[in-house]
Amino acid sequence: MKQQHTLTYFISSLVILVFCVSVNAQNDSIPKTVKDTLIIKEKYGLRIGADLGKLARSFFDDEYSGFEIAADYRLKKRIYIAGEIGFDEKTTVTDYLDITSTGSYIKGGIDYNMYQNWLDMDNMVYTGFRIGASTFSQNLNSFTIYNTNQYWARQFTSNDLQEFKGLTAIWVELIIGMKVELFNNLFLGLNVQLKLMASETEPDNFGNVFIPGFNKTFDSSGIGVGYGYTLSYRIPLYKKNK
């Protein structure tokens, strides 16, 4: 009787041991959860484009022609070196003045991307600054001297062309905008600029009405505004882990 009890205990223990080994083997055969090893890489490169707004305005506005080339280079994850170079010709006509402003400009600065992209998205919502410089000329086509007492004398009007060359201007501007990747490496952008004049040379007897790159001046306040619609293509140079 005692031997039968001992045999039963031995068999039971053996069954339990085999069961435990079997369970352990099954657990070992189940693959463990693998940590996500997907590595997303971000593109770094040179982005070059044109201002579509200036091209469209040149087509529709008879008193304006101009173009602008814009570029940026991704320096760090959120920091871009950026700049623009362009040309403007604008004729301003008022009741007392007809003047054509012509010249070129260059701007350079930094953009900071505030937008956190998902996965491999590559869009921008950014803010930045520029330092701009322009060299230009003003052609005074005609002008009228306003006379408050027209009873005794008529207003004086001159149609003699006067040219003022070698004028310069330097300014700073704040910029905010966005760039959306339409297709692989092709971007559509929109931005607005607030400009503050640092220094300028003016023609004799009147102020600058329009400065290339700075745009219209407002009552000699030294404040200007601008906007841009850009289409650009990025030349990818290398990638970094996100």
What does each model-identified segment do?
Residues 35, 54-57, 92-98, 158-164, ...:
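Extracellular loop and loop/strand-boundary signature of outer-membrane beta-barrel proteins
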